[in-house]
């Protein structure tokens, strides 16, 4: 029997209608896996050995009672076959420390989804620089004068921090906007932090597409997140509306170009953000949108994921 651990935010607070981690647990349970639940505070390191307090778990699609803890134990993480790291950002120093603990288990043979080193290496915004032929025009800088020159060149730009999620602190600065200076100062904290500028993509009106990639293979359907009227952010957390769709030709092209690199880096479950035919982000920490896509199309994304995990476990 496969023992699957999951590190996540408190399961008591999730919305099971939309939660991708919950969907993964349902599929793992359906396959007869033993489920071990952990929060960040359960992980620890003693003399180089990664351990945790885990609670064995059963889950069900029931809005009144969706989980039950069936036991509690303290065990070496190496006792688990696979661990899903599903803690939501912020990607802060605490998150980084947890990846070192998970990496000690990985060294003992546990499969970690996604690979701890790659979680540290691949910032969701900056990792797109490795695929710059697919992205909008992009500037990463602390320098206000460079941001101003970029804005003057493109006249309509998006500014964002490198560590936001859910559309937080994303600004659109149009031609003639008097606020560029103060936005640049705010995002760079007066030149002490990097921020990202990209030319505005009018295709955002048709949605910001979340394309999921499972161990290098694109899922054939995506979720287009369509901004509310007058809004430039499609994120569901920012009030956008989700619309599942089949991938377009350019979506396939982008996902197939990036897929092999993701697979090689042990990034087994990844969410690409695509606007029009441009790649804007590569989400590696805790990608979502499984449930919305599965509700609309005949595809089991969690099935693809568990198949990929089983294939990797057999190779070990």
Curated annotation (Swiss-Prot):
Boundaries of every ATP-grasp domain copy: 125-310
Per its UniProt record, the required cofactor names are: Mg(2+); Mn(2+)
Protein name listed in UniProt: Glutathione synthetase
The molecular function GO annotations come to: ATP binding; glutathione synthase activity; metal ion binding
GO CC terms: cytoplasm
Per the record, the gene is gshB
Cofactor details (free text)? Binds 1 Mg(2+) or Mn(2+) ion per subunit.
Q: What class of enzyme is it?
A: ligase
Q: What is the lineage of its organism?
A: Bacteria, Pseudomonadati, Pseudomonadota, Gammaproteobacteria, Enterobacterales
Give the binding site residues for ATP: 151-207
Q: Which family does it belong to?
A: Belongs to the prokaryotic GSH synthase family.
**Disulfide linkage:** none
